A protein has these predicted regions:
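N-terminal signal-anchor transmembrane alpha helix
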Residues: 3-26
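Terminal transmembrane helical module of multi-pass membrane proteins
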Residues: 125-169
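Core segments of transmembrane alpha-helices
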Residues: 55-72, 91-94, 119
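Membrane-interfacial loop-to-transmembrane alpha-helix junctions, especially the N-terminal start
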Residues: 7-10, 79-87, 138-141
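Aromatic-anchored segments of alpha-helical transmembrane domains
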Residues: 21, 90-97, 149-156
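Hydrophobic alpha-helical membrane segments
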Residues: 89-98, 111-129
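Cytosolic, membrane-interface loops and tails of multi-pass inner-membrane proteins
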Residues: 28-47
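Membrane-interface helix caps and helix-loop-helix hairpins in membrane proteins
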Residues: 77-78, 99-110
Length: 169
C-alpha cells in the first residue's frame, strides 16, 4: 500500500479535528448540566458555561483551523506546514487532557472517545512521519509539543484562577 501524500495527511488532520469537535459539540450540553468533580476543579471560563456559546466556540475552533489546513494544502509554505503540525500537537496534548478529564470525572468526558481512539494514535503517526520524512526537524516537533503543553496548562490555570476569584471570601 503506497504511503499517503503529505496533502492527504494534512487533510486527515482536518478530518480528525472535525470528528473530535463533533463529539464535543454533541455531548458538551449534557456535560455542562451535570454536577461533577471536574467542573468544580476546572470549570470552563464563564462565557463558555452557556451551551450555545460553547457550541459557537467549537464551530470557530474547527472552521478557523480548517481554513489554515486548506491554505497549507493549496499554497504549500513551510510556515503553513508548521502551523498545521502545531495544530496536530495541540490535538495530541488535548487528547491527554481528555484522558485526565475522564479520569477525574470517573467516566466519560466530552471528546474522550475521539481523543483516545483517533487523535492520540494519529497524532503520533503524523509527527513521527513529519520527522522521518524531514518535513520539520525533531527538535521543532518537541518545541511545538512543548508550546501546546504550556498553552493547555495556561488554559487550565486561567480557568482555575477565574473560579478562585469568584469564590466568596
Amino acid at each position: 500500500m503506497p504511503a499517503l501524500s503529505r496533502n492527504t495527511v494534512l487533510a486527515l488532520i482536518g478530518a480528525t479535528l472535525v470528528l473530535h469537535t463533533t463529539e464535543e459539540y454533541l455531548t458538551v450540553p449534557a456535560y455542562l448540566s451535570s454536577a461533577n468533580r471536574l467542573l468544580r476543579l476546572l470549570p470552563p471560563p464563564e462565557f463558555l458555561q452557556n451551551p450555545q456559546r460553547q457550541r459557537v466556540a467549537l464551530v470557530m475552533a474547527t472552521v478557523l483551523p480548517l481554513a489554515v489546513i486548506a491554505w497549507a494544502i493549496l499554497r504549500p509554505r513551510k510556515a503553513l506546514l508548521v502551523s498545521v503540525l502545531f495544530l496536530e500537537c495541540i490535538l495530541l496534548i488535548n487528547a491527554g487532557s481528555h484522558m485526565f478529564a475522564a479520569w477525574v470525572r470517573g467516566g466519560y468526558a466530552p471528546g474522550v472517545i475521539t481523543a483516545v481512539m483517533i487523535n492520540l494514535p494519529f497524532g503520533v503517526y503524523v509527527l513521527r512521519r513529519a520527522v522521518k520524512e524531514q518535513w520539520i526537524p525533531s527538535r521543532t516537533v518537541w518545541q511545538l509539543i512543548g508550546i501546546a503543553l504550556v498553552l493547555q496548562i495556561a488554559a487550565w490555570a486561567v480557568s482555575w484562577l477565574d473560579k478562585q476569584s469568584k469564590m466568596p471570601r
